[in-house]
Amino acid sequence: MTDGQQARVAVVTGGSRGVGRGIAIALGSHGYTVYVTGRTRTTGESPWGGTIGDTAAAITAAGGKGVPVRVDHRNDEEVAALFARVRDEEGRLDILVNNAALIHDELQSPLPFWDKPLAASVDLLDVGLRSGLVASYYAAPLLVETGRGLVVFTSAPGAVHYQYGPAYGAHKAGLDKFAADMAVDFRPFGVTAVSIWLGVVLTERVKQIIDSGPELGYLDDIAETPEFTGHVIAALAADPDVLAVSGRTLIGAEAARQYGISDRDGRHPPSVRELMSVQPATYHGRIRR
């Protein structure tokens, strides 16, 4: 679990709960020191529970070292300070997981976008899309210095089909394109950038949906645990040939099969390609500088 006698280091943004929390804990189980960011420090601040301190403790309990850092990803100075701290305390960065997203409940209503609060769209583009660029910007020099670094964007099929309106679609499509274009800049330095499509994930919100009616029980059968993608990310980081997939949007369930990773109770979650007949966009290989 070490590399050159140094613990491997990851930063996971948006890790108070949900997918980010699961990814951070999974990386901890692989021996990573994980800096986990979020805004929630006190129990009860969010109706969905969870704090960055709780996540950090779970990372440590899983076998890694959890470091909670309160970061508002709308504040670029706080993001810059995060990576300055990682440099000072660790001297390296192996993985950045861009997961932070500010999703209002109103965004998921069936109304047309103009009948939803404007903040529901703008906030997601700020903390979700823009925040991924800013975090990658400040992480890049440290990743390049470390060598063989990995940048991950957590994404979803909403990148290529309608879901929750144009802001959500632009968010997911933008993350996938971030991975594609950052890969071009990172390639000479051996750093990999990928986007990973998640399936249905057993987050706090999804569990509430499943519990709301027996007809929704099928979701539990196909859902991924929040930790599932974290194990996929750890496998990617350990793969000596990972640069071959740099720039791609990966379907997490398919990558898991390739690496022999199963989820709870030995399950193999279905690919969204199978569930929804969707696949990531294909980008032209032309590079213009």
Model-derived segments and their meaning:
Residues T2-E90, H104-P112:
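Short-chain dehydrogenase/reductase
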Residues L102-E106, W114-L118, G149-P188, G199-V201, ...:
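Catalytic loop of short-chain dehydrogenase/reductase
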Residues A7-R8, G64-K65, R92-L93, L143-P157, ...:
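Active-site loop of short-chain dehydrogenase/reductase
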Residues V12-T13, N98-A101, G128, G149-A156, ...:
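Structural signature of the Rossmann-like NAD(P)-dependent dehydrogenase/reductase core
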Residues D94, W114-V134, V152, L175:
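Catalytic Tyr-X3-Lys loop
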